[in-house]
Amino acid sequence: MALANPCLDFCLGIFGTGLWSVLDNLCVLKRGKPPVAWLATEKIFMTLKSVRPKKFLGQHFLKDQNVAKAIADTVDACPDIPVLEVGPGMGVLTQYLLPKKRETKVVEIDFESVAYLREEYPQLEENIIEDDFLKMHLEHTFGGRPFVLTGNYPYNISSQIFFKMLDYRELIPCCTGMIQKEVAERLAAKPGCKAYGILSVLVQLWYDVEYLFTVEPGVFNPPPKVKSAVIRMTRNEATSCGCDERLLRRVVKTTFNQRRKMMRGSLKPLFAQLDQEQGRTAGGHADFLAQPLLTKRPEQLSVQDFIDLTNAVEQEMKG
């Protein structure tokens, strides 16, 4: 295949395909964006009609059309609002979102994927956002309008994506897509399950979670070492969590970070922090820590139990 840049053609003649590894290493420095000196070669990648998955970006490109269509169909549960796809890669999912005739934007950090999408999906030109999703101000994405979040999410940031979703929950009534099976199980887990943890409680506080189906590694390039799963999360009717949400997050994270301890043991460090923040002498919470609920471990508490516990901790600190 003839290349569009004679300088790069010459370099390839000397270094062979190893040059691509050099380019990859350079791109690591810019989180998926090329150094300025290589910007002029962007069109070269467009001529290759392919994008090589990058491990440092957690890319595993979906190649099964049936799975892609099934994921695209999950957004139908929340009709009549725009769609934002995270990490479209080569557009395997995108191609099934576009015919739905809904305003669709994609956010992609990898410059090579962006170049490919511009070439293969010219109708997306104005709706390709070249950015890091985790750093975006989502209120500007659709002018403050609610939207569906979807994607074949990069495995290395999937949990971070859902924590960001929680921060923008008023704008995201529905979130669907594919993630590691382990993360999907954590999202959908109920009290008493080994998978039940921080993500389970904080997400289920605001969303109803559905584990839709499991996906085998062979439908990806490259195949991941783990199975994947498709999930759908739909905002529940809660308008308030019923407690101080910041304190709730601290209670949940503190206790699950010591999940093998009973609640009374895992809460002691939190009370020490709260006492210090309020300028109080540490200790003095023995009666509170003696209540029966705190003989349980965190995975035994429901979302409502954590809400009630947070309110009780707040009252204890006011006493």
Locations of regions flagged by a protein language model:
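Ala/Thr-enriched low-complexity intrinsically disordered regions
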Residues: A2-A4, T17, A37-T41
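Intrinsic disorder/low-complexity segments
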Residues: P6, D24, G32-A37
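Residue-identity detector for glycine
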Residues: G13-G18, G32
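Catalytic cores of RNA-modifying enzymes
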Residues: R31, A37-T254, E299, D308-N311, ...
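C-terminal lobe and adjacent flexible extensions of AdoMet/dcAdoMet transferase-like proteins
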Residues: R235, T254-G319
